[in-house]
Amino acid sequence: MKLLEERILKDGHILGDNILKVDSFLTHQVDFSLMREIGKVFAEKFAATGITKVVTIEASGIAPAVFTAEALNVPMIFAKKAKNITMNEGILTAQVYSFTKQVTSTVSIAGKFLSPEDKVLIIDDFLANGQAAKGLIQIIEQAGATVQAIGIVIEKSFQDGRDLLEKAGYPVLSLARLDRFENGQVVFKEADL
């Protein structure tokens, strides 16, 4: 997605060898016009697949997931990283390791929001090692629902997340694919669109 790649080049900041900071438009402050375009692109790609729910993980996946769900006219569910007292029955959980935060969290979704009839599109902000998507897949499959595809805003193609997910049989669509960081700049790999 050219618009996204341009924004990454303009406002993204490389930290160390493998972290791209995009807090000015995605992971802290949200550019809603960009998220709306991202949502439209995902919706156009997956409209014919019969998606009934969009699922993400809090927090930075929420904005692109909301706009994708809006464009598809289906509900959006986000997995919570912290358990609260109102989620006390029928909880579906999985362990998820965060590459960026270097911690493992138990993420959860109330089972009443997913059913075996659901066809789910997973949307997330980043794909690095694939652990967030893997955890969401486990939760969705616990409900008996089907994962139709995984939509990623920014993929770190130099990490093994895509390979892990595709080998398990899940289609992955990334709007921006980072090939590498070179001399303080992002070098893109050809995106899926």
From Swiss-Prot:
Which cellular component, as a GO term, is one annotated location?
cytoplasm
Report the domain of life of the source organism. Answer: Bacteria
Q: How does it assemble?
A: Homodimer.
**Where does the chain bind 5-phospho-alpha-D-ribose 1-diphosphate?**
128-132
Family of this protein: Belongs to the purine/pyrimidine phosphoribosyltransferase family. Xpt subfamily.
Q: Which residues bind xanthine?
A: 20, 27, 156
Cite the CDD domains for this sequence. PRTases_typeI
**Do you know which HAMAP family this protein is assigned to?**
XPRTase
Q: Any idea where this protein resides?
A: Cytoplasm
Reactions catalysed, semicolon-separated, are:
XMP + diphosphate = xanthine + 5-phospho-alpha-D-ribose 1-diphosphate
Q: Which UniProt keywords apply?
A: Cytoplasm, Glycosyltransferase, Purine salvage, Transferase
Which species expresses this protein natively? Answer: Streptococcus pneumoniae (strain Hungary19A-6)
Record carries keyword Glycosyltransferase: yes
Q: Name one GO biological process term.
A: XMP salvage
Role, per record? Converts the preformed base xanthine, a product of nucleic acid breakdown, to xanthosine 5'-monophosphate (XMP), so it can be reused for RNA or DNA synthesis.
- Output this protein's name: Xanthine phosphoribosyltransferase
Which Pfam families does this chain map to? Pribosyltran
Q: Quick one: which pathway?
A: Purine metabolism; XMP biosynthesis via salvage pathway; XMP from xanthine: step 1/1
| Known EC number | 2.4.2.22
| GO MF annotations, alphabetized | xanthine phosphoribosyltransferase activity
